Structure formats: structure tokens, C-alpha cells
């Protein structure tokens, strides 16, 4: 492996461009070797934005980027429907991968990725559930694992966005937005989610016509805990993520510290972040740095393909619960030995 890990970044949109900047200017031990995007001009703009013209190759084809000189690892930040194919192409080349969520558009595709990796006999992919790298979430995880508050009984979660993009559907509140809470709950509690119920309040006047927003999503775990998630993607005021763990001997709450108090003529007010890239900027930096460090040691240490599959399976059950209005069990395949818990 070279002194700087050569990374091919797939996707040069909002997330991809941010990762191109991050690998080039923030993390240590890595460099951007290639960028691929179907829109060549967008890819060139992202590369030019970091002064990479001439030293970073630009491609419209994923496989060409994977085969570009100096590529030793892959960061997938393309649209979700392209992730499965890109992951399998990286596996075929033995390239380590950091893949943004979703790992695949559905659980069937996610399971194919899990099975392909299992056939290799070693982990190659880390999935981008960045909340595991957020300082507050890590502090809460440490507290729960330490047992000081007794067993966790409930998680109360809030996930709010300023507004939803034009293509957003009611199902996407679950399989796009709440997928982060799905992984966070599994990780914090150390349990699989076993059933989902979705309650549908009267839609907000600020929601686009036909969008069921907000929703209240209730998860049950295999260990008997309950997780509730308020998801509201057109709240209008900011990006807000909170979580409270209610345990036998106390509770712990995170997420309230990410506002800024502004004092000006006429008074003082709190300002809420407007974007997830602002709220979780440090978590993204730690996530990518951790991936680079582990990859340079020949390891995969973060959330893996099984976590990507589990999130997809739970989200599918959630969408069925949204459509039917009834409690829906989560149907999951057996966990491969490659992903057995330690």
C-alpha cells in the first residue's frame, strides 16, 4: 500500500463532493485518486473545487474509476440504487469500501451484498452509519454498555428536517430518514429490531400534497425494549436529531447541544443547524478517518454489510406497516458467521 491510501470516490453530488473535500483536505493518510459520476462536468467541478485538476482522474464509468491508476480503496457516495453494483465491482477487485447508506435499495439486494462478501471469507465493506461516530452518540453508547443506569427500556428519538426534496415519498420517511435511527437503535441497544408499527398523524400544512409527514414509528426489539421515532421532514425550522434512553435507574438524553445562541438587537435566540452535513460534520470526519486508518492496517472496524442488510430489512417492514396500518414483524435472513457478534 502506498504512503497515502488512493481512494476512488463514486458520486460527485452533494454528499460525494463533501467526501472528495474531506478525503483531500481533512483526513490524514489518504488522497483522492479518481472520481466517477455520470455527469462528467459535475465530477470535474468537484475535482476542480479542491484544486485536483490534473492529479485526480475523472470518469463517467464506475469500473473505469475502480481500475484507475493508484486506486486502492473506494468511497461510494452515488445514489442508493447504484450501490449494490458498485459494491460487487469493488469486491471483485478486492478493494476495501466505505459505502454510504443505503447499502442497496431493498433487502434482497442488501442480502446479495452480504452473501457476496461472505463468499470472499473476509470483510471488505464498511457502511456509512455515521451516527456511530458522533461524540454524543458514542458517549451514550458507553453509558449504556457500562450499565450504570441499568437495562435500557425505551429510546425516544426525534428526526426533523427543514424540508423534503421534490422526489420524497411517504415511504422514504422510513427507508431514507429513519434508517439512521434503525441502525442507531440496534447499535445502542445491542439488539435486533423485531417488529414495527407506524402511526400517521394528520399531515402538516407544510408537507407537499400527498406526503404523510410527520410519522411516529414504533419499533420493538428482540430483548423487549421499545423505540419510538418522531420523523418530520418538513418541520420548517432546522435539522434536529435527538435521542433519550430511558433505563431502569435513570435516563440520558443527547442532541440538545447542537444549537447556537445568537444575541443581537432586540434579544437573543437559538439557531438550529439547517443541514445534516453541518450537524454531523465531525462525525463524518471521524468516520472517514477511522475507515482510512483501519484500511491501511488491513482491517474493517465499522458497521458492516450485515448492518446495512438489517437496516434494509427493518425499513421494509416499516414501509409495510405504514401501508397497512398494522404491527409488522421484521423478516430477516440468518446472520452469516462472518458477521457473528464478538
Swiss-Prot record:
Keyword annotations: NAD, Oxidoreductase
GO biological process per UniProt: inositol catabolic process
Pfam families (UniProt xref): GFO_IDH_MocA, GFO_IDH_MocA_C3
Catalytic activity, as annotated: myo-inositol + NAD(+) = scyllo-inosose + NADH + H(+)
The protein's Enzyme Commission number: 1.1.1.18
InterPro entries: Gfo-Idh-MocA_inositol_DH (IPR050424), Gfo/Idh/MocA-like_OxRdtase_N (IPR000683), GFO_IDH_MocA-like_dom (IPR055170), MI/DCI_dehydrogenase (IPR023794), NAD(P)-bd_dom_sf (IPR036291)
Superkingdom to which the source organism belongs: Bacteria
Gene3D superfamilies: Dihydrodipicolinate Reductase, domain 2, NAD(P)-binding Rossmann-like Domain
Molecular function terms, GO-annotated: inositol 2-dehydrogenase (NAD+) activity; nucleotide binding
Binding partners and assembly: Homotetramer.
Role, per record: Involved in the oxidation of myo-inositol (MI) to 2-keto-myo-inositol (2KMI or 2-inosose).
Family membership noted in the UniProt record: Belongs to the Gfo/Idh/MocA family.
HAMAP family recorded: IolG
Listed PANTHER family: INOSITOL 2-DEHYDROGENASE, PTHR43593
Name of the featured protein: Inositol 2-dehydrogenase
Organism annotation: Streptomyces coelicolor (strain ATCC BAA-471 / A3(2) / M145)
Record gene name: iolG
